[in-house]
């Protein structure tokens, strides 16, 4: 027995020696930021990316799925370009948490600085954030960000070999889309947002005009607002058939070859429907409202992002209706969208019940925070792990229609921590905080949970509940909102939504079906085994129906107008055929 103890002791000593050796990083990684006569000092998030291949640049190989490569991040604060940056050997990484955990082998390495700008907020806070530069808050594509060319590096048992990188490449500006006969583009300075952010802030919109808009100056039009992620231009509309020479591209998401051709076919089909003599004449708009936190604002007022709800509803939309002959009354405005856009459509309808006449919310982001994906922020103590005396099980964040899991809440949040602290990653959980949370003493959003441990803050959770939990708000205020929202709420979701968003829809449906005086008189529907983002089409597969948002709700909208338009409303000027 003694000899066994001796062998065990030797084994443990050897194991400890190996651990100590592997934890030591002797590498020197230096990053040079070339001088710029217009900006000597710089702030931002310095990202270092390792990838096994260079078929596409490493900066484009980071994601939350199984194909992701490795990324590390550190802050750069008031840095003088004359000085090299020694990359922090203790910088947090994803999915490998530290440099000493990198597997041995050869990698392609690239560095990128996500540049921050300084904002003097009307709240009295000074914050440093990445300004959107026309790309929709994408750190690896944002104009003005600087990066290095990829280099090949060897990682040994003691970590990466020493190497230098120069951020001598710059992402160029993005060309603005040009007006066409059908689609117009505007930029609108918001006085409300400019006052909050301490600088000029612009909202954008892409406007699809109805057939023969110029030939009918007497016509005024209802307005359809398509909410969703940042649109570079008006999508899903083309005036010509699919390109004959277009090479088929495979869609991993839908397991379909030639999906790019299908997209062009659907866009052309919509153009033909839009011109059909019997198709109602509407204005459709897609809004650009990126913030320093995300590719859009969630279209509501918030402590951290400012009054985007009021800016869109009371500034932008009346301006568009004036310029493009909208009817300009609440009964003539309709909201729709999926995912983020689904939440926005419902939230805006709830927050501004008299200004809109119906919402069609597909696969909305969590509309009940007791089902914040798979987390109950009111009852759960931790967002990353299920509660158990002995077992450790992470909470999933993404599945396919068969339930196969590809990511967890902890992993998603750790990637965000690498991309940016203080809710500055530009990713999903951080924008929810930027939208729903109160402002912290340092001017950044308060955390709903500790980003490292997952421990939930009940005070912040209660703030979310009172201000942005849509199911709770409807239940709390139904005596005030019920009559204003009757017949206006339509919600759709697949019962195998990839992000478990159907769970919140179930609880919302339970409340809505319990309403009386008045009964909500709307619609909640589910797609069997349908993934994100099913939108209510029971006849076609998801990969088709997601391309038909701009026409699929029109029959329901027309029915709504028929039963709700006030006496004397203009129901004829926009119903011309030619």
Task: Annotate each PLM feature.
Residues 38-54, 314-315:
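Short, solvent-exposed linear motifs at loop/edge-of-secondary-structure regions
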Residues 1-5:
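Positively charged n-region of N-terminal signal peptides that target proteins for export
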Residues 52-92, 97-578:
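Non-catalytic cap/lid and distal C-terminal segments of serine-dependent acyl enzymes
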Residues 14-17:
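C-terminal motif of bacterial Sec signal peptides marking the signal peptidase cleavage site
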Residues 24-33, 39-47, 202-206, 225:
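Contiguous beta-strand segments within globular domains
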Residues 19-23:
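Bacterial Sec-dependent N-terminal signal peptides
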Residues 6-10:
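Sec-dependent N-terminal signal peptides
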């Amino acid at each position: 027995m003694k000899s066994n103890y001796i062998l065990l002791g030797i084994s443990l000593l050897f194991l400890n020696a190996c651990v100590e050796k592997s934890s030591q990083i002797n590498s020197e990684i230096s990053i040079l930021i070339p001088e710029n006569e217009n900006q000597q000092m710089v702030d931002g998030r310095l990202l270092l990316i390792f990838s096994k291949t260079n078929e596409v640049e490493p900066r484009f190989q980071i994601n939350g799925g199984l194909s992701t490569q490795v990324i590390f991040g550190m802050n750069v604060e008031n840095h003088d370009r004359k000085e090299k940056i020694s990359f922090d050997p203790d910088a947090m990484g994803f999915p490998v948490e530290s440099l000493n955990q990198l597997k041995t082998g050869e990698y392609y390495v690239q560095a990128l600085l996500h540049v921050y700008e300084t904002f003097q907020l009307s709240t009295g806070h000074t914050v440093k954030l990445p300004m959107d530069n026309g790309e929709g808050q994408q750190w690896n594509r944002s104009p003005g960000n600087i990066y290095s060319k990829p280099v090949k590096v060897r990682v040994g048992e003691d970590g990466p070999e020493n190497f230098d990188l120069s951020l001598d490449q710059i992402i160029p500006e993005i060309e603005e889309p040009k007006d066409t006969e059908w689609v117009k583009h505007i930029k609108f300075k918001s006085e409300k947002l400019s006052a909050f952010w301490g600088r000029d802030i612009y909202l954008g919109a892409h406007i699809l005009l109805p057939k023969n808009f110029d030939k009918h100056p007497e016509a005024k039009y209802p307005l359809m607002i398509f909410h969703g992620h940042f649109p570079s231009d008006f999508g899903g509309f083309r005036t010509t058939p699919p390109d004959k020479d277009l090479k088929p591209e495979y869609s991993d998401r839908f397991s379909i070859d030639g999906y790019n051709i299908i997209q062009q076919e659907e866009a052309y089909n919509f153009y033909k429907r839009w011109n059909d003599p019997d198709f109602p004449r509407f204005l459709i708009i897609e809004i650009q409202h990126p913030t320093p936190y995300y590719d859009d604002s969630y279209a509501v007022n918030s402590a951290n992002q400012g009054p985007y709800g009021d800016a869109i509803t009371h500034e932008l939309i009346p301006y568009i209706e004036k310029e493009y002959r909208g009817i300009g009354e609440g009964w003539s405005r309709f909201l729709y969208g999926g995912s983020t856009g689904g939440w926005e459509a419902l939230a805006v309808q709830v927050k501004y019940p008299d200004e809109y006449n119906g919402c069609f919310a597909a696969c909305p982001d969590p509309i009940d925070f007791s089902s914040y994906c798979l987390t109950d922020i009111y009852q759960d103590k931790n967002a990353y792990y299920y509660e158990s005396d002995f077992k450790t099980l992470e909470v999933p964040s993404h599945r396919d229609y068969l339930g196969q899991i590809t990511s967890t809440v902890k992993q998603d949040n750790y990637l965000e921590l690498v991309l940016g602290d203080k809710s500055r990653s530009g990713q999903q959980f951080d924008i929810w905080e930027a939208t729903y949370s109160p402002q912290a003493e340092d001017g950044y959003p308060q955390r709903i949970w500790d980003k490292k441990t997952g421990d939930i803050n009940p005070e912040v959770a209660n703030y979310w509940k009172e201000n942005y939990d849509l199911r709770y708000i409807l239940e709390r205020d139904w005596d005030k909102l019920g009559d204003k929202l009757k017949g206006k709420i339509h919600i759709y979701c697949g019962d195998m939504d990839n992000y478990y968003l159907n769970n919140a829809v179930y609880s919302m449906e339970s409340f809505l079906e319990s309403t009386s005086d008045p009964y909500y008189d709307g619609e909640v529907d589910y797609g069997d085994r349908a993934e994100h983002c099913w939108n209510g089409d029971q006849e076609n597969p998801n990969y088709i129906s997601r391309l038909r948002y701009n026409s699929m709700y029109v029959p329901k909208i027309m029915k709504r107008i028929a039963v709700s338009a006030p006496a004397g409303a203009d129901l004829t000027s926009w119903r011309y055929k030619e």
